[in-house]
């Protein structure tokens, strides 16, 4: 399944034909933005049909530049409708989409460009102005500039009317020969990079078809007109999660950035039904003083993933936003939805006073096989900890141009995730921790996530990370790095240590607590423990 198939199939099924002019005139500022793609930062709307037209014209531009099926084309732009235009054009010609996160460093994105062998770059003018050396590195001839309502210097209105210079009017039939083989690569996604330099996971047509099948089964179209809000980076899960709502005929509301007051206002004003946010962004919403003043009755799926979430903050989110929270577990190598914690699961946890359900990431998703393996590859029974491994058509094809790294995580048909987990008797999977994050102190194995979950529940704590630091006596000393909600408040190191001792015992309790103004985070909001470890460790093998 190509990405453009989500758009084309939706149009064919639902006949979304709303006109931009009518929506621009009648819908702007009102609660219903209409059916299509609405860019709130650039004040522009494209109906589904207009998006098809624009993508056809841009695909023709790419063809003129010599782009062939399976060539790699990157988008380096903030969230925008223009970025969606580029994505669908890339897909329509059968090329491979590589999204680059604007919050990455330039060096990190240049490494991804070089790893992938990018042939054409869609580049936002704001990025070009910030990094003029990028053009010298990549070449102006193979760069297409976009900004706001313009791509390649042309307004959307011109593209809709098929007035691309030297291309002329192009119809959909011109692109029926683009690659649709189930094993053809559709997109490349950078791995988290939280434990080292990012690799590129290849998602095939079959991967995307499976993502679609799973997501439609787990999160069917709502009972009211759908609006999906994209505010977290399109280059990662928030963007990837938007394609099934597109297939279901949802309006896509696009903003760049996660300012709490603005997001909450958009949810109310535009009657948002779906959104995806990482836990760190949800914490910001919950901390906003006026969070309870807005109307969230339109929400059907408030999707969170990408990192563990505090149980206490999750309970608060359910209280404020309603019974709409859903969670998935996945990674770039096994994308989006290996497991699913449904709305009903969240409610069951509250009704039965069973916080272990909220600490889990749900049950195994349809079309996915999942097992807990020991170090020798043997499957472990329920309630025993081991490494999570997965099978199924959801998996990536492999790491781009890195067969050795692909082979290293695959064994007897299973793909190892690098995550330690345990499956309970009811089928709920709990992520214990990253295998590499485990602390060995005094001969005991300690998983930081258990300690972090406890500290997160303390009223004064905004966020925390627990790591092992070198210690002559214990080998590694359990250390908590803490962000306070109020940076001006008086830190209580001994209070945190004693609280953890009372709940977890002396082995797992931190031996020291350090208070930082801000934890280092990746562009998608994950705490970068490798950066924290650099402060304490000199051994390069442990800085992962």
Where are these regions (language model features)?
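AMP-binding/adenylate-forming catalytic core of the ANL superfamily
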Residues: 104, 121, 267, 275, ...
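Gly/Ser/Thr-rich phosphate-binding loop
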Residues: 247, 273-276, 286-355, 369
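Conserved ATP/PPi-binding loop(s) of AMP-dependent carboxylate-activating enzymes
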Residues: 363-367, 376-408, 446
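Conserved AMP-binding A3 loop
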Residues: 45-49, 186-210
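Conserved AMP-binding/adenylation subdomain of ANL enzymes
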Residues: 209-227, 235-274, 288
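Conserved pre-ATP/AMP-binding loop-to-beta segment of ANL
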Residues: 161-190, 197, 220-227, 366
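Conserved AMP-binding/adenylate-forming
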Residues: 44, 59-104, 445, 483-484
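AMP-dependent adenylate-forming
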Residues: 5-47
């Amino acid at each position: 399944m190509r990405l453009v198939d989500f758009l084309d199939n939706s149009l064919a099924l639902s006949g979304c034909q709303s006109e931009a002019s009518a929506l621009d005139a009648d819908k702007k500022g009102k609660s219903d933005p209409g059916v299509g793609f609405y860019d709130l930062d650039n004040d522009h709307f494209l109906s589904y049909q207009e998006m098809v037209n624009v993508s056809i014209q841009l695909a023709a531009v790419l063809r003129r530049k010599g782009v062939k099926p399976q060539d790699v084309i990157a988008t380096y732009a903030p969230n925008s409708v223009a970025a969606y235009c580029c994505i669908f054009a890339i897909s329509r010609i059968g090329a491979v989409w590589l999204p680059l996160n604007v919050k990455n460093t330039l060096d990190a994105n240049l490494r991804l460009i070089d790893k992938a062998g990018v042939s054409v770059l869609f580049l936002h003018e704001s990025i070009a102005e910030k990094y003029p050396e990028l053009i010298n590195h990549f070449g102006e001839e193979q760069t297409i500039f976009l900004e706001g309502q313009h791509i390649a210097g042309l307004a959307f209105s011109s593209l809709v009317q098929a007035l691309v210079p030297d291309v002329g009017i192009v119809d959909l039939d011109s692109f029926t020969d683009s690659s649709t083989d189930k094993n053809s690569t559709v997109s490349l996604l950078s791995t988290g990079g939280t434990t080292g330099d990012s690799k590129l996971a290849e998602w095939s047509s079959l991967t995307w078809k499976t993502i679609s099948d799973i997501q439609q089964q787990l999160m069917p179209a709502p009972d009211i007109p759908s609006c999906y809000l994209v505010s977290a980076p399109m280059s990662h899960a928030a963007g990837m999660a938007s394609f099934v709502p597109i297939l279901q005929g949802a309006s896509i509301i696009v903003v760049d950035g996660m300012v709490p007051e603005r997001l909450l206002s958009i949810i109310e004003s535009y009657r948002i039904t779906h959104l995806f946010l990482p836990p760190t962004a949800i914490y910001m919403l919950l901390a906003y003083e006026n969070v309870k003043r807005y109307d969230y009755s339109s929400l059907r799926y408030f999707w969170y993933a990408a990192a563990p979430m505090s149980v206490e903050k999750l309970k608060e989110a359910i209280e404020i936003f309603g019974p709409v929270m859903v969670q998935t577990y996945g990674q770039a190598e096994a994308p989006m939805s290996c497991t699913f914690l449904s709305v009903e699961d969240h409610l069951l946890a509250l009704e039965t006073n069973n916080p272990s359900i909220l600490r889990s990431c749900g049950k195994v998703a349809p079309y996915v096989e999942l097992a807990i393996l020991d170090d020798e590859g043997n499957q472990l029974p329920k309630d025993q900890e081991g490494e999570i491994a997965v099978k199924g058509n959801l998996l990536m094809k492999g790491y781009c141009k890195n067969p050795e790294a692909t082979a290293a995580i695959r064994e007897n048909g299973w793909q190892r995730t690098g995550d330690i987990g345990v499956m309970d008797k009811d089928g709920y999977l709990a992520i214990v921790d990253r295998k590499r994050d485990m602390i060995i102190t005094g001969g005991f194995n300690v998983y930081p996530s258990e300690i972090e979950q406890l500290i997160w529940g303390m009223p004064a704590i905004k966020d925390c990370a627990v790591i092992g630091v070198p210690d002559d006596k214990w080998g590694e000393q359990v250390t908590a790095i803490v962000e306070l909600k109020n940076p001006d408040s008086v830190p209580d190191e001994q209070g945190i240590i004693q609280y953890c001792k009372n709940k977890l015992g002396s082995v797992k309790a931190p031996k020291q607590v350090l208070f930082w103004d801000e934890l280092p985070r990746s562009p998608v909001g994950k705490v970068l423990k490798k950066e924290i470890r650099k402060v304490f460790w000199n051994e390069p093998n442990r800085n992962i």
